[in-house]
């Protein structure tokens, strides 16, 4: 006979180890409703206080994965690989990474999310493109992933439904920041998508959800160990998010930035370093390249030849967007009516910025949601964001605000200028790739 939910809660509350059958039974109850909201909340709090070892976390991840549909890509000839980012400001990496890796021979069926807090969402960015369907039929999703090599869509209700219920409960019970629960939440959705290898981009800094280096490494290590324990080859990069990654933040503006990158216009930037490092990890994990140097050379080749841009355009068209989108993006991406420069308040070097607040400025412009049902203004945001370490003269633009009207542009420009520190001495450059983690 299965153990009662309250006995499982008691066992974890007292710091004892749960076996896989107990965890699977409890998560089945979360899914079918036989475990009450109060019991699920108590379980989450017990895990928050007592933690879980790797085997427990693997069992929790697999139980949540198996709570709904799981995708099977075994009929595809291409190796299946995916990437997940913990989120930041100006982080449009998925938009370039998927077509680059696809052009190198992998399949990237990427299930992405919307904006969360101050961070932008890949789906919101793609919805800047007229006609792009983030919820295609399963058949179309599979066909595009196979024939184009990449397809970026939204999560369906059938993937990891236990996570959806448990996350909603964690959100209102102060248990969001539990490493085992974060790990299982992220990985259950990724594993349900049927991938065979995964690369994680775990952000660190004042523009990420994790600001403490030690805590960030604990989360990255947990994700890597649990995913590998669940049978998916996984590695992680910890990357710097103490400034926006791209030089744009906002939905249509980040699509424009993506196209500029795919045209080869962002070589050598922090964004380029992250894209290439993740592409190399993915290609090695997929077995397409033997080592990172070979993988990066492949990625650079398809970027330079235009093959990656071609894949992006094909993905957009096959998922409902314009056939000539990459050739004529200006004809399709809406433009904000008010654009205003943000002038530097003095001469000197940009030494730091409040990245999270830059993300919140985009939300205040209408580029993100305060309430779940808010409509997004895809036109608005920030461009021309100067990287830290740049020497500027007084009055020189350090960013441009794109707003729905002039008064809003002026208000946000006044705020943005206060978010940057300028000093006489050039700051030390932070490496954008902080560290790499692999299993073992």
UniProtKB/Swiss-Prot annotation:
The entry's keywords: Glycosyltransferase, Transferase
GO BP annotations, alphabetical order: pyrimidine nucleobase metabolic process; thymidine metabolic process
SUPFAM superfamilies: Nucleoside phosphorylase/phosphoribosyltransferase catalytic domain, Nucleoside phosphorylase/phosphoribosyltransferase N-terminal domain, Pyrimidine nucleoside phosphorylase C-terminal domain
EC number(s) reported in the record: 2.4.2.4
Pathway: Pyrimidine metabolism; dTMP biosynthesis via salvage pathway; dTMP from thymine: step 1/2
Superkingdom assignment: Bacteria
The protein's enzyme class: transferase
Gene Ontology MF annotations: 1,4-alpha-oligoglucan phosphorylase activity; thymidine phosphorylase activity
Function, in words: The enzymes which catalyze the reversible phosphorolysis of pyrimidine nucleosides are involved in the degradation of these compounds and in their utilization as carbon and energy sources, or in the rescue of pyrimidine bases for nucleotide synthesis.
Subunit structure: Homodimer.
The protein's name: Thymidine phosphorylase
Species assigned in the record: Rhizobium meliloti (strain 1021)
């Amino acid at each position: 006979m299965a153990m009662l939910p309250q006995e499982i809660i008691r066992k974890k509350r007292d710091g004892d180890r749960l076996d896989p059958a107990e965890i699977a039974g409890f998560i089945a109850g979360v899914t079918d409703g036989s475990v009450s909201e109060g019991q699920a909340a108590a379980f989450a709090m017990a895990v928050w206080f007592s933690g879980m070892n790797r085997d427990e976390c693997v069992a929790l991840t697999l139980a949540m994965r198996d709570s709904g549909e799981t995708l099977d890509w075994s009929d595809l000839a291409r190796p299946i690989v995916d990437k997940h980012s913990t989120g930041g400001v100006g982080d449009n990496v998925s938009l370039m990474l998927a077509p680059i890796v696809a052009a190198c021979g992998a399949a990237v069926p990427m299930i992405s999310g919307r904006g969360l807090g101050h961070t932008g969402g890949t789906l919101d960015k793609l919805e800047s493109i007229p006609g792009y369907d983030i919820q295609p039929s399963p058949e179309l999703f599979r066909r595009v992933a196979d024939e184009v090599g990449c397809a970026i869509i939204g999560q369906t209700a059938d993937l990891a439904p236990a996570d959806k219920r448990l996350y909603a409960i964690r959100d209102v019970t102060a248990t969001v920041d539990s490493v085992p629960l974060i790990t299982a939440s992220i990985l259950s959705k990724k594993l349900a998508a049927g991938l065979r290898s995964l690369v994680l981009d775990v952000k660190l800094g004042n523009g990420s959800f994790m600001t403490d280096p030690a805590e960030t490494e604990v989360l990255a290590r947990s994700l890597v160990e649990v995913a590998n324990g669940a049978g998916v080859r996984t590695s992680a990069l910890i990357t710097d998010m103490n400034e926006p990654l791209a030089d744009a933040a906002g939905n249509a503006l980040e699509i424009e930035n993506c196209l500029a990158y795919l045209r080869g216009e962002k070589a050598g930037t922090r964004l380029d370093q992250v894209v290439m490092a993740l592409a190399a990890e993915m290609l090695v994990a997929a077995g397409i390249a033997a080592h990172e140097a070979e993988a990066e050379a492949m990625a650079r080749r398809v970027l330079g030849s235009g093959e990656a841009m071609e894949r992006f355009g094909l993905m957009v068209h096959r998922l409902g967007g314009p056939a000539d989108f990459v050739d004529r993006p200006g004809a399709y991406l809406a433009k904000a009516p008010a654009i205003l420069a943000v002038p530097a308040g003095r001469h000197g070097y940009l030494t730091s910025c409040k990245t999270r607040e830059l993300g919140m400025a985009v939300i205040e412009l209408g580029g993100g949601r305060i309430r779940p049902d808010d409509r997004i203004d895809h036109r608005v945001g920030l461009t021309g964001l100067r990287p830290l370490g740049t020497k500027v003269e007084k009055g020189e633009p350090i960013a441009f605000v794109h707003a729905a009207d002039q008064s809003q542009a002026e208000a946000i420009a006044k705020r943005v200028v206060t978010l940057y520190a300028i000093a006489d001495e050039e700051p030390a450059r932070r490496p954008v790739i902080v560290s790499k983690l692999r299993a073992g």
